[in-house]
């Protein structure tokens, strides 16, 4: 079946006694609304990724099913996980800590005072890309941080305890009056001010 079958997935989880569930915030929102409170009775771990976890979705799952959603972060090139909240190392509104053996560097971004552009390397990083202009030649990752490093294109902040907060994509910032502004924040403010309308 497809994850878009919002009523079927909870039924399958119930019938098959699933103990782990992975999904995006969007899918988990729909599953949470469509499911009966007992559908996820065997589920012990719910992991969210690929997009920011909506706090309302996290609250819905905690109240309706007694399950805390563990948010993670990664990229396809990194097989795909880089950071993850766990039951014993959890901090709300973050994507958790880096997995063991994942190295990271933050490269400053002009106009952004907090955090930096995330570059990573580790055993889970791809070997490289095959590019159309050089068929059959593997191009290893290369970034500002050096050979073997992958530029995620994301601006993140890391707190004193090692928890990572994704601030946005570098391409999703605009320079306004000399200051870098996250377009996602503008969208969130517009939605909060007028939730019944679509916003660009």
Regions found by a protein language model. Name each.
Residues 40-43, 99, 197-198:
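Core-facing hydrophobic residues within beta-strands of well-ordered domains
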Residues 1-20, 34:
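Conserved AMP-binding/adenylation subdomain of ANL enzymes
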Residues 94-101, 110-142, 179-181:
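Conserved ATP/PPi-binding loop(s) of AMP-dependent carboxylate-activating enzymes
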Residues 50, 74, 96, 154, ...:
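Active-site glycine-centered loops adjacent to acidic/histidine catalytic or metal-binding residues
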Residues 26-28, 53, 125:
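Alpha-helix capping/helix-boundary segments
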Residues 18-23, 32-91, 103-105, 110:
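Gly/Ser/Thr-rich phosphate-binding loop
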Residues 104-106, 137-139, 154-158, 200:
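A structural signal for short hydrophobic beta-strand segments in well-ordered beta-sheet cores
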Residues 14, 21, 116, 122, ...:
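AMP-binding/adenylate-forming catalytic core of the ANL superfamily
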């Amino acid at each position: 079946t497809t994850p878009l079958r919002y009523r079927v997935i909870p039924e399958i989880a119930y019938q098959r006694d699933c103990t782990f569930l992975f999904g995006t915030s969007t899918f988990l929102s729909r599953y949470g609304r469509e499911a009966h409170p007992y559908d996820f009775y065997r589920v012990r771990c719910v992991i969210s990724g690929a997009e920011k976890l909506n706090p309302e979705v996290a609250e819905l799952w905690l109240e309706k099913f007694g399950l805390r959603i563990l948010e993670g972060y990664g990229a396809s090139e990194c097989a795909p996980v880089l950071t993850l909240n766990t039951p014993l190392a959890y901090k709300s509104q973050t994507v958790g800590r880096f997995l063991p053996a994942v190295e990271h560097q933050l490269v400053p971004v002009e106009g952004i005072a907090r955090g930096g552009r995330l570059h990573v390397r580790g055993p889970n990083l791809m070997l490289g890309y095959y590019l159309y202009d050089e068929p059959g030649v593997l191009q290893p990752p290369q970034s500002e941080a050096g050979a073997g490093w992958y530029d995620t294109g994301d601006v993140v902040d890391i707190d004193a305890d090692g928890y990572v907060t994704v601030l946005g994509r570098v391409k999703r910032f605009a320079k306004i009056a000399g200051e870098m502004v996250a377009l996602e924040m503008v969208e969130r403010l517009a939605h909060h001010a007028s939730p019944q309308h679509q916003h660009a």
